């Protein structure tokens, strides 16, 4: 195929190819030529033009296929347009000659069609250059059309359309002739010709003014005739044509020359034209008159559907502005349609007409108008409703009761009211909370108007009114309670009026049904009210026969609707409901038989209505409250069902006895019974099987069943993909609502067949009876029965397959197969589809390979012998579906046979239907065969491509099947498409050629399949799909009028956006720039302005299909993920434009900050003001689209968080912006705040929630970003007023609870962020929370509860959580300010308002703390109760808790779960601040009891609790909640909750009283440790692990205090001084044993060991000994890891102190092993760079351990001494065996050794050889060459010399001389650096300590040694001047020491001076020099101080 890519056709390569590949080669060449010609130089084209034209002409005359001829025509026209156009007339003449040819043979037809196509393309491209031959060509074409077959007529019409497009106004001379030909084409028998003629006329009307002026009536009549018997495509084309003409007539695009008597059409005239077709159709005068006389309607439904679509097109073209202006008149005219007697003679016609009018209103108002215009339209509709209601009311009150209203008036008004009310409901539901102005407009009185219709005499109008109220309730949940109260009140007042009972009960039921769609619900009291009302209606039904039926129906309707509120409501009413059901049915089956002997037709009608209602209520309970269906309740059902089944068998005799007036009631009863039986388990009514089966057989096959709505019944039973065989009528489409009217048919039994039943032992008889019924009947009745019984059996098979049960023995299989095969060969295509699916289910149920094989062989035989299309289509589909549920095709033999048969059938050109079904079956086989199909791929691709290139465009159904087949083949090849082999390249080329053929198709479904195939190709081989051609084709179809095509386009875009979002967007913009201006749509303009993403936002706003909207949103998210950072400003502006594109939103403005000079008068509400902003790419977007834009903003912020840190750093962003052309989020903070404000203050509640969420995200992400220009400030400070203004509306009294709850969350985050710097700002925000707190105190017992009680829970807990967060922040801030570090910082910084705000926050909270603390405790108590296991549910308070009611337990749980942790932390902090001192604050700040028990503060005298009890309750409440949560096995718990729990426990244990309680209760302490141990194992978060260890330290501290107190008490009480022994306390007692699971010490050991081993696995003997373990590895520890290890060691060091002496001996070896093990790792340097922090912790732990009182206790002293000696030995051994690193490691070892020597008892260190080795270690350290080690050694010796005499003496004796000699050497080698200087100074101090450690008697001798050394370190005057800095420092230090020590020992000094004159001279010289230096400094003039300016300039201007 690569050889086809040239300017001229490679004829040699082409001739060598086989015949079937030649066409593909030519097509590929033409494809390439089409792309190449526009890019080729004109001269090159001219040079080769002659040869090129010859080649193209050769292709033209070689019978090209439809796709080839289309490409050929385009290429031929391009050649003349790009090259020389002079010879084009020759080609035109040649084409005309071909068209004139007399050759009528089928082989010449493709050439003639190609010539026609070429003419169209030539004239379209060259236009007026061919004007000379135009008339001749047109005449020739129109003449040929008369004798042409359907393909020719279609092609000629399309050719003429292109000619008109090319010539424009120049073609005016032939307009009339073309019009005449197109008129004929409009009513052609071929649907494709009708479509082509409509397109031709659509192009003609651009210049032919007469079409929409003088000829408008005739064209309209012609269009009406064209709609008769039309298909979907024709209706779309005709509606587009006629709608355009009517719009042109009303709003002409060009001026019409004035003619006598002519005038511009008015809206009334245009609608009258449509009305004539709508009411009379396309019939002539005589036929219409005859219909009028006969009283029948001749208007077919397809005409009405077509006119409906025309009306939508007409209004859409005129646009939203026109509609807004003229809606009142349009509405009036549409209502005339709905109420016209011609359209409403029969009920079915009336329903169809109403649907059409409703569709027009929905398709125009719902898509063209913005929210403000929709509100205006709703007001107009309200006026229409009021007008109609007034007419009916007037007729009701005139005259007597007999003549109160004519049926015609009621009928006319009811249809108008139904249409108006349904549209009003849809508008309000779409507008949601933005419809609030409608309710507030008292002039309209919308609610009064709608409710008034509930009294209408017509049931349809009443139900429409009820539905409208339901829509209002869904859109505005706040109205549910109000409307319910109002309807109940009116119903109680008008119980004697039948219409009122029926209307208001329907309204109440509708409102109850709306509650499940509202997240806020209604109060449970409303349920009780409705239950009482329903009981009252049912009990009073028999009191007045005139309204018995209405009360009965109303009562049961209310009970059925009540069940939709769910089990939490119904469980309270179930006993009463069961009693009502019992009363509705006889007590037994015998009573049913007795009933038959009494009553009349009226009583039976009431009885049947009542029982049908009861069954409906049972069904509603089963559907909505499955949890309540206990065995007991089901047992109560069984007698009722038995009676109902018994009555079922008696219905025929009852109807026979009392007439047909009760037939409807009997049918409804039967339906309700079948519905409930279908929902229940069959075992429940097992005794009634026989009766039910007989009745079902009769209902499915009975003689009264004459019609069947198979279009409603069968599609749901067919396989979804098989429905594609049945055309676009069963596909999803925009017009589905009215298109379904065409398939309604009769309703005889069509609603009963969905009831599946299970066949047991009577299966064989039932199936045989089914087959017999089908055999006996003929004609339409046979088909009806066949559909019913086959559908019933199919449902059985499906049920058996889903439950994995068997059908039965072979006797059952035979009739089953017979039944399905009969349906497979039926004339109804839907039935055949369902039968094929039924065979697949039968094979699945039987699981018999032999049966499957025999079934396929039978189909093969049938296909070989049968010649009729019906049989062949059915069995072809069966071949494809048989293996559908068996895991696919696994037999190569079956696959080969199947492929061979289907290949043959798919090439049967005589029957397009057989081709279509065979190809669809082949696609199914490809899917099911999987890799097994690979051997057939090449042949399949060849077949599909050949058929695609040869199938006429009129056979679109075959093209659709080919598309599905190609898609399956691409999927089968899969990732292999990426290969480079010759075979793969050929397959890939075939795929691309096939897709190109389908893309050029005129059919939208074929185009959609082409896009789907390209999407598959892109998934498997993305680099071979050319985006530059694919994306433009997608964008062109983005606004297609076909839903399936739009879905395919967006699905493909979604996939492309995941990989190449930027390229896709660029290609889209490039396409729009290249488009001719004539084709520009609003979408193109949008793409040009804001890119493809902006167009997708526009499309999202217009679309109503959920699947398509979801795909659009995902596409936008993918595009944003790829490009949001690189095009940040673009995306943010796009979101801002979308958000502000609302005509009526208060936020649709540019928002500017207004700051007043007077701070006291400053108010948040003035922070923003709106300025009109009309410009922008979007207009009137809906709230849902704007909500999505805010979600996009949040996504952008989240994306930036994971990218460059400069996004959240203003200084860094500004710096990088100077060097790079990058953008950062922080630079757009003003826009983010502005958008959040706009959304937060919108009318739409959903948008307000989205805005508040965005504001919350902004606060969390930007609160810590500093402001570079104002150090010490953050960037958000400048937006304080803006945030306050955004929050304020959410705290309004009328704000919904969910909005207020979200605002509380934002409020607390704002306060806690620390941004607020001014105390006044802080007070303003605090006041918002204070107002909410007051609302919480009022409580849930308010009389007008609008929402469910759980909303009070949500709001209350949100408020309490917000206050808790604020309090936590305030306390933490206060603690930080009180810390010493913070004090220093505050003193060093200037005092500012930030400090005032921080200090003021705690004061503000403390004013409400008394109230808050009680509320917090109450909320925690509620939470504790709700977390009890289910078997404790009986312990829950019957009235509920403080913030929830008993009925809303389940709804309340999530709200408690989201808030409890923060409240727990705050409560613990409050208790910490009070020190658990109970203060009686009094109830002054609390307006209601907080909780049933008030947490121990009840004022009842009998229940007064002591402060101790109250504290105990509070402590155990917090402990219990914390322990329960931390024990939870769920790993998904939020880390914040765990942190809050741990911090709460820490806050508690900081207070002595709770610490003593925990210390006293060892079981509790052990349990806590066990939980903390599991937590540290399961959570990897370092912060959690650190918090755990801190908490363990507090628990150990509590135990220490307890043990200390016990010991002290024992000593005092028992008189320890007088007794030899004192009882021992602590773990281990007398034995020293520690019991796992009961021992606190053991638990702490486990926890610490776990922590240490995880960080230092070398400590574990098992891991160290393991050859593959981590023992040998060295792991570097982070700073956090070091903190964890240090904390664990600190805990370990404290453990012996809580043991008895014996217990301490048990635990000491482990503690020492771990401590020394960590020390060893630290000394080895294996812990990394953070070892300094760890070493200090180790040494502190060692010191704590050595100073433990247990080391000196009498009972343990000996053991401790031995163990410590062993430890010291180990330490010394590691010194000698391990390679000690120089520097800090050696120092660490020396330090630890010193701690041992100083703090262990002398018994430990004085034994040999330990003492000697210690001395040797120090002696070795004194020989070190490292001055740091020397310095530290001297410091440690200083400590030792100052230590106890037994410790110091040996070291003084052993090392004193060494010390002196080293100091004497210092004179010779003076220090050269700071380290050496420090070592000498430390040595001097050590020697000084040695001197002063000596006895008084020996001290002078030692001073006599020290003083010469100091004097020797002095320098003379000359040496001092030139000496290094270290030497001078040593000189000065030595002199100071001499002047300090000398006077203390003057005698020694004098003796020394006398004996050593040279020393005396040196000393005197040094003193003299020092004195002179001091004097010179004192006489020096003071330096002039240079004041630093207070304001620093950033630029030095000097």
Swiss-Prot record:
Q: What is this protein called?
A: HEAT repeat-containing protein 5A
Q: Where is the composition biased (Basic and acidic residues)?
A: 1162-1172
Q: State the Gene Ontology BP annotations.
A: endocytosis; protein localization; retrograde transport, endosome to Golgi
Query: What top-level branch of life does the organism fall under?
Result: Eukaryota
> What do the Gene Ontology cellular component annotations say?
cytosol; endocytic vesicle
Question: What are the boundaries of the signal sequence?
Answer: none
Which family does the similarity line name?
Belongs to the HEATR5 family.
User: Where is the region Disordered?
Assistant: 1149-1176, 1608-1630
């Amino acid at each position: 195929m690569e050889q086809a890519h040239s300017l001229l056709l490679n004829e040699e390569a082409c001739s060598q190819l086989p015949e079937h590949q030649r066409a593909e080669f030519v097509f590929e060449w033409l494809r390439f030529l089409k792309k190449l010609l526009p890019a080729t130089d004109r001269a090159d084209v001219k040079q080769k033009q002659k040869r090129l034209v010859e080649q193209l002409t050769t292709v033209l005359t070689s019978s090209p296929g439809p796709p080839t001829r289309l490409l050929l025509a385009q290429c031929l026209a391009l050649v003349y347009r790009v090259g020389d156009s002079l010879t084009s007339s020759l080609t035109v003449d040649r084409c005309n000659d071909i068209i004139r040819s007399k050759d009528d043979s089928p082989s010449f037809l493709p050439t003639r069609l190609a010539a026609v196509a070429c003419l169209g393309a030539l004239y379209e491209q060259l236009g007026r250059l061919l004007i000379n031959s135009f008339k001749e060509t047109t005449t020739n074409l129109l003449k040929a059309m008369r004798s042409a077959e359907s393909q020719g007529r279609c092609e000629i019409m399309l050719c003429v359309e292109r000619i008109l497009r090319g010539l424009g106004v120049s073609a005016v001379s032939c307009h009339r002739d073309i019009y005449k030909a197109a008129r004929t084409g409009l009513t052609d028998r071929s649907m494709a010709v009708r479509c082509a003629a409509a397109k031709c006329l659509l192009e003609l009307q651009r210049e032919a003014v007469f079409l929409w002026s003088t000829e408008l009536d005739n064209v309209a009549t012609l269009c009406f005739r064209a709609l008769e018997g039309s298909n979907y495509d024709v209706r779309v084309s005709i509606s587009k044509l006629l709608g355009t003409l009517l719009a042109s007539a009303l709003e002409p695009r060009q001026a019409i020359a004035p003619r006598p008597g002519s005038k511009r059409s008015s809206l009334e005239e245009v609608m009258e034209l449509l009305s004539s077709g709508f009411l009379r159709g396309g019939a002539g005068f005589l036929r219409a008159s005859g219909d009028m006389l006969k009283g029948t309607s001749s208007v077919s439904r397809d005409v009405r559907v077509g006119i409906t679509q025309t009306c939508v097109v007409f209004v859409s073209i005129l646009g939203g502005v026109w509609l807004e202006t003229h809606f009142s008149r349009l509405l009036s005219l549409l209502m005339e349609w709905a109420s016209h007697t011609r359209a409403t003679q029969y009920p079915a016609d009336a329903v169809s007409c109403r649907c059409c009018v409703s569709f027009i209103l929905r398709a125009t108002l719902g898509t063209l108008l913005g929210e403000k215009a929709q509100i205006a339209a709703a007001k107009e509709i309200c006026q229409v409703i009021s007008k109609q209601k007034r007419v009916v009311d007037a007729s009701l009150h005139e005259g007597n009761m007999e003549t109160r209203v004519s049926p015609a008036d009621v009928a006319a008004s009811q249809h108008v009211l139904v249409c108006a009310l349904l549209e009003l409901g849809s508008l309000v539901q779409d507008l949601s909370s933005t419809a609030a102005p409608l309710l507030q407009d008292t002039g309209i009185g919308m609610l009064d108007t709608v409710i008034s219709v509930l009294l209408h005499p017509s049931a349809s109008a009443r139900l429409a009114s009820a539905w409208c109220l339901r829509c209002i309730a869904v859109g505005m949940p706040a109205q549910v309670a109000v409307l319910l109260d109002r309807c109940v009140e009116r119903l109680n007042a008008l119980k004697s009026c039948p219409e009122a009972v029926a209307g208001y009960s329907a309204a109440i039921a509708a409102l109850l049904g709306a509650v499940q769609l509202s997240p806020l619900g209604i109060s449970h009291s409303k349920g009780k009210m409705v239950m009482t009302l329903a009981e009252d209606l049912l009990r009073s039904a028999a009191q007045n026969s005139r309204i018995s039926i209405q009360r009965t129906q109303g009562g049961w309707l209310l009970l059925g609707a009540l069940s939709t509120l769910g089990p939490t409501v119904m469980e309270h009413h179930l006993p009463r409901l069961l009693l009502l059901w019992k009363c509705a049915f006889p007590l037994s089956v015998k009573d049913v038989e007795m009933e038959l002997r009494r009553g009349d037709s009226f009583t039976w009608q009431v009885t049947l209505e009542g029982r049908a209602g009861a069954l409906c209520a049972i069904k509603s309970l089963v559907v909505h409250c499955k949890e309540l269906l206990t065995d007991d309740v089901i047992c109560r059902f069984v007698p009722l069902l038995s009676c109902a089944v018994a009555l079922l068998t008696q219905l025929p005799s009852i109807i026979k006895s009392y007439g047909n007036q009760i037939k409807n009631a009997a049918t409804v009863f039967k339906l309700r019974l079948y519905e409930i039986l279908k929902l229940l388990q069959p075992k429940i009514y097992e005794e009634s099987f026989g009766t039910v089966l007989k009745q079902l057989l009769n209902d499915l096959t009975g003689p009264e069943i004459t019609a069947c709505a198979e279009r409603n019944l069968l599609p749901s039973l067919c396989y979804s993909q098989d429905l594609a065989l049945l055309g676009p009528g069963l596909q999803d489409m925009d017009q589905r609502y009215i298109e379904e009217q065409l398939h309604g048919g009769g309703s005889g039994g069509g609603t009963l067949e969905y009831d599946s039943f299970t066949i047991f032992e009577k299966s064989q008889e039932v199936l045989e009876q089914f087959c017999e019924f089908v055999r006996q009947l003929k004609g339409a009745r046979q088909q009806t029965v066949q559909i019913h019984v086959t559908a019933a059996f199919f449902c059985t098979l499906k049920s058996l397959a889903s439950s994995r049960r068997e059908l039965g023995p072979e006797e059952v299989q035979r009739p089953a197969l017979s039944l399905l095969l009969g349906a497979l060969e039926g004339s109804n295509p839907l039935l055949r589809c369902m039968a094929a699916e039924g065979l697949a289910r039968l094979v699945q149920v039987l699981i018999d390979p032999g049966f499957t094989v025999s079934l396929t062989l039978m189909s093969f035989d049938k296909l070989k012998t049968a010649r009729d299309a019906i049989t062949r289509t059915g069995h072809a589909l069966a071949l494809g579906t048989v293996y559908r549920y068996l895991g696919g095709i696994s037999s190569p033999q079956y696959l080969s046979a199947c492929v061979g048969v289907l290949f043959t059938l798919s090439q049967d050109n005589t029957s397009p239907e057989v081709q279509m079904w065979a190809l669809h079956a082949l696609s199914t086989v490809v899917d099911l065969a999987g890799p097994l199909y690979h051997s057939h791929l090449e042949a399949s691709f060849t077949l599909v491509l050949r058929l695609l290139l040869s199938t006429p465009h009129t056979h679109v159904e075959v093209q659709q099947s080919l598309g599905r087949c190609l898609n399956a083949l691409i999927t089968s090849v899969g990732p292999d498409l990426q290969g480079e082999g010759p075979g793969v390249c050929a397959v890939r080329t075939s795929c691309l050629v096939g897709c190109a053929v389908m893309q050029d198709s005129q059919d939208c479904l074929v185009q959609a399949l082409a896009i789907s195939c390209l999407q598959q190709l892109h998934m498997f081989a993305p680099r071979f799909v050319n985006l530059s051609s694919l994306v433009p084709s997608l964008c062109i179809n983005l606004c297609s009028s076909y839903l399936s095509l739009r879905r395919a386009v967006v699905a493909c875009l979604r996939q492309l956006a995941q990989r190449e979002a930027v390229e896709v967007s660029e290609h889209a913009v490039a396409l729009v720039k290249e488009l001719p201006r004539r084709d520009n749509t609003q979408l193109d303009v949008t793409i040009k302005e804001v890119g493809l993403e902006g167009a997708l936002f526009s499309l999202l706003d217009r679309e109503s299909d959920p699947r398509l909207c979801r795909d659009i949103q995902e596409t936008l998210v993918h595009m944003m993920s790829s490009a949001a950072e690189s095009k940040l400003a673009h995306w943010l502006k796009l979101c801002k434009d979308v958000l502000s594109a609302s005509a009526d939103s208060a936020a649709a403005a540019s928002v500017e900050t207004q700051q007043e000079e007077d701070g006291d008068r400053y108010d948040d509400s003035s922070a923003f003001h709106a300025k009109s902003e009309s410009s922008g790419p979007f207009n009137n977007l809906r709230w849902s689209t704007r909500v999505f834009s805010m979600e996009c903003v949040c996504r952008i912020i989240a994306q930036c968080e994971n990218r460059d840190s400069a996004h959240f750093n203003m200084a860094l962003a500004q710096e990088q912006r100077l060097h790079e052309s990058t953008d950062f989020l922080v630079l757009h903070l003003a826009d983010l705040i502005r958008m959040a404000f706009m959304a937060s203050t919108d009318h739409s509640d959903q948008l307000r929630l989205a805005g508040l969420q965005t504001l919350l995200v902004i606060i969390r992400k930007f609160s810590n970003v500093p402001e570079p220009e104002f150090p010490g400030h953050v960037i958000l400070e400048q937006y304080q007023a803006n945030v306050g203004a955004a929050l304020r509306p959410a705290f309004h009294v009328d704000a919904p609870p969910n909005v207020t709850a979200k605002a509380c969350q934002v409020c607390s985050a704002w306060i806690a962020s620390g941004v607020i710097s001014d105390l006044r700002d802080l007070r303003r925000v605090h006041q918002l929370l204070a107002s909410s707190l007051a609302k919480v105190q009022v409580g849930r017992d308010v009389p007008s509860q609008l929402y469910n009680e759980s909303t009070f829970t949500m709001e209350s807990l949100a408020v309490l959580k917000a206050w808790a967060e604020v309090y936590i922040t305030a306390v933490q801030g206060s603690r930080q300010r009180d810390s010493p570090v913070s004090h220093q910082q505050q003193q060093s910084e200037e005092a500012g308002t930030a400090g005032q705000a921080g200090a003021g926050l705690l004061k503000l909270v403390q004013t409400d703390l008394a109230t808050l603390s009680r509320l917090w405790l109450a909320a925690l108590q509620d939470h504790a109760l709700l977390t009890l296991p289910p078997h404790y549910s009986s312990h829950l308070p019957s009235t509920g808790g403080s913030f929830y009611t008993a009925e809303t337990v389940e709804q309340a749980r999530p709200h408690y779960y989201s808030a409890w942790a923060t409240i727990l932390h705050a409560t613990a902090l409050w208790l910490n601040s009070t020190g658990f001192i109970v203060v009686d604050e009094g109830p002054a700040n609390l307006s209601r009891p907080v909780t049933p028990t008030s947490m121990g503060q009840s004022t009842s005298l009998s229940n007064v609790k002591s402060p101790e009890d109250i504290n105990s309750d509070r402590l155990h409440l917090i402990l219990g909640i914390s322990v329960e949560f931390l024990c939870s096995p769920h790993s998904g718990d939020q880390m914040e909750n765990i942190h809050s729990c741990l911090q709460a426990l820490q806050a508690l244990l900081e207070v002595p009283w709770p610490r003593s309680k925990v210390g006293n209760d060892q079981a509790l302490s052990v349990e806590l440790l066990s939980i903390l141990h599991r937590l540290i194992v399961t959570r990897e978060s370092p912060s959690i692990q650190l918090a755990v260890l801190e908490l363990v330290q507090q628990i150990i501290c509590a135990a220490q205090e307890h043990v200390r107190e016990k010991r002290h008490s024992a000593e005092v009480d028992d008189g320890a001084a007088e007794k030899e022994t004192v009882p021992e306390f602590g773990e281990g007692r007398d034995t020293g044993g520690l019991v796992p699971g009961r021992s606190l010490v053991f638990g702490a050991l486990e926890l610490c060991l776990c922590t240490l081993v995880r960080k230092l696995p070398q400590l574990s003997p098992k891991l160290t000994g393991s050859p593959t373990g981590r023992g040998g590895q060295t792991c570097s520890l982070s700073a956090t890891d070091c903190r964890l290890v240090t904390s664990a060691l600190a805990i370990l060091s404290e453990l012996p102190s809580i043991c008895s002496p014996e217990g301490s001996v048990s635990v000491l070896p482990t503690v020492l092993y771990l401590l020394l093990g960590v020390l060893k790792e630290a000394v080895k340097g294996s812990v990394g760079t953070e070892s300094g922090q760890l070493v200090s912790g180790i040494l502190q732990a060692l010191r704590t351990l050595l100073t433990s009182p247990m080391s000196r206790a009498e009972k343990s002293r000996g053991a401790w001494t031995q163990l410590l000696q062993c430890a010291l030995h180990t330490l010394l051994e590691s010194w000698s065996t391990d390679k000690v690193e120089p520097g800090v490691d050696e120092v660490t070892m020396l330090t630890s050794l010193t701690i041992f020597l100083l703090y262990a008892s002398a018994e430990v260190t004085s034994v040999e050889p330990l003492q000697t080795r210690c001395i040797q270690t120090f002696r070795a350290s004194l020989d070190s060459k490292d001055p740091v080690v020397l310095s530290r050694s001297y410091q440690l010796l200083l400590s030792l010399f100052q230590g106890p005499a037994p410790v110091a003496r040996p070291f003084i004796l052993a090392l004193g001389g060494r010390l002196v000699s080293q100091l004497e050497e210092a004179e010779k080698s003076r220090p050269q650096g700071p380290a050496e200087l420090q070592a000498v100074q430390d040595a001097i101090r050590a020697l000084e300590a040695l001197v002063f450690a000596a006895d008084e008697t020996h001290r002078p001798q030692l001073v006599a040694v020290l003083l010469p050394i100091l004097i020797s370190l002095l320098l003379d005057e000359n040496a001092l001047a030139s000496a290094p800095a270290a030497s001078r420092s040593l000189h000065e230090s030595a002199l100071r020491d001499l002047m300090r020590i000398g006077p203390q020992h003057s005698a020694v000094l004098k003796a020394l001076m006398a004996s050593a004159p040279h020393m005396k001279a040196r000393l005197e010289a040094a003193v003299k020099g020092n004195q002179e230096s001091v004097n010179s400094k004192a006489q020096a003039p003071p330096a002039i101080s240079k004041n630093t300016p207070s304001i620093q300039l950033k630029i030095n201007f000097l």
